[in-house]
Amino acid sequence: MTIRNQRFSLLKQPISSTLNQHLVDYPTPSNLSYWWGFGPLAGICLVIQIVTGVFLAMHYTPHVDLAFNSVEHIMRDVEGGWLLRYMHA
């Protein structure tokens, strides 16, 4: 089996063909500009904000005296907390 035949056999699988149909061969009008691509990017940003916000809220303490300490705890003691905080920003 050649490489070309392997590629086509993968596209005939139900999951691969569905992804190909909805992501690659998506029917769109020809008069769309490149601004059309910013919709999915905004959606990805929204999902990242929601997911990181939920994880940050698990470690945050909304009290006047403890808020700064909880942010320091997130940055220093939580595994990957610095990454969560900067991804959320």
Swiss-Prot record:
Q: Any idea where this protein resides?
A: Mitochondrion inner membrane
Protein residues bound to heme b: 88
Gene from which this protein is expressed:
MT-CYB
Record's protein name: Cytochrome b
As for what it does, the entry says:
Component of the ubiquinol-cytochrome c reductase complex (complex III or cytochrome b-c1 complex) that is part of the mitochondrial respiratory chain. The b-c1 complex mediates electron transfer from ubiquinol to cytochrome c. Contributes to the generation of a proton gradient across the mitochondrial membrane that is then used for ATP synthesis.
Alphabetical list of Pfam families matching this protein = Cytochrome_B
Q: What else is known?
A: Heme 1 (or BL or b562) is low-potential and absorbs at about 562 nm, and heme 2 (or BH or b566) is high-potential and absorbs at about 566 nm.
Required co-factors: heme b
Which residues are in coiled coils?
A: none
Record's bilayer topology term: Multi-pass membrane protein
Any one GO BP annotation for this protein: respiratory electron transport chain
| Species the sequence originates in | Brassica napus
What family, per the record? Belongs to the cytochrome b family.
| Protein keywords | Electron transport, Heme, Iron, Membrane, Metal-binding, Mitochondrion, Mitochondrion inner membrane, Respiratory chain, Transmembrane, Transmembrane helix, Transport
Which GO molecular function entries does the Swiss-Prot or TrEMBL record give? electron transfer activity; metal ion binding; oxidoreductase activity
InterPro entries recorded for this chain?
Cyt_b/b6_N (IPR005797), Cytb/b6-like_sf (IPR027387), Di-haem_cyt_TM (IPR016174)
Give the primary localization class.
mitochondrion
Q: How does it assemble?
A: The main subunits of complex b-c1 are: cytochrome b, cytochrome c1 and the Rieske protein.
- Indicate whether Amino-acid biosynthesis appears among the record's keywords: no
Annotated TM spans = 38-58, 82-89
Q: How is the cofactor bound?
A: Binds 2 heme b groups non-covalently.
Could you state one GO cellular component term attached to this entry? mitochondrial inner membrane
PROSITE patterns reported in the protein's UniProt record: CYTB_NTER
